[in-house]
Amino acid sequence: MAVITMKSLLEAGVHFGHQVKRLDPRMKRFIFSERNEIHILDLQKTLQGIKDSYELVQSVIKNGKKVLFVGTKKQASEIIEQEAKRSEMPYVNNRWLGGMLSNFNTIKKSVQKLKKLEKMEVDGTFEMISKKEVSQINREKLKLAKNLTGIKDMEELPGAIFIIDPKREQIVINEARKLGITIIAVVDTNCNPDVIDCPIPGNDDAIRSVALFTKIISDAILESDKEVGIQIVENLNEEDLMSEIEVKNERKES
């Protein structure tokens, strides 16, 4: 059973939002306070978002669907790949190709081409062609693999998408909404939570925060067949929480 504590969220810097001037007004309901011109997120609402997303993910998996992990920013890329592989789910961590969802049949053809090129590498084809041809094939294979490796085994549209930084991944959200695919996302203070089916208020820039959220989603998938839920331990009251919150240089503003 996954156990989440208020202290673990604080240690990961989950509560740190962006500078006050970067607030999306639609995020106001998730704001706890303000410190040194930095917004502090309400961790009670973060915990609720975690609980809701955990249950939603397990429901998707039990219905025989997959969860697509998406995070293309530098802080998220490696974590997204690692946790998606751990839970044997598809992922996109380099660049979202327009139409990955809305034009899925065309994308599948590109995936089939990638698989064909990979097969040529091991079935003896390379021994029968020139070095120049091998070089050309390898270049094409690497180009396709860069963006498609994570979805090679995604035979149909996912039941849900988990996104790190929905503000960055607007194309993903637009495609998913048009197709009615459930969207779960970590929403920072500069995001629009209204386009997300299951928003999780949190820091989407700090690596520890991104890792914590992504691991929770992966754990939910892995435990979906065990009828195991998530345990929330709220071991800090509001007074303790306020004393713990000290904004130093936890966030690099761009």
From Swiss-Prot:
Database matches in InterPro entries: Ribosomal_uS2 (IPR001865), Ribosomal_uS2_bac/mit/plastid (IPR005706), Ribosomal_uS2_CS (IPR018130), Ribosomal_uS2_flav_dom_sf (IPR023591)
Gene3D superfamilies, alphabetized: Glucose-6-phosphate isomerase like protein, domain 1, Helix hairpin bin
Keywords for the protein's UniProt record, in alphabetical order: Ribonucleoprotein, Ribosomal protein
Pfam families (alphabetical): Ribosomal_S2
GO CC term (a single one): cytosolic small ribosomal subunit
Domain of life: Bacteria
Listed HAMAP family: Ribosomal_uS2_B
Protein name: Small ribosomal subunit protein uS2
Organism of derivation: Borrelia recurrentis (strain A1)
Lineage: Bacteria, Pseudomonadati, Spirochaetota, Spirochaetia, Spirochaetales
Gene: rpsB
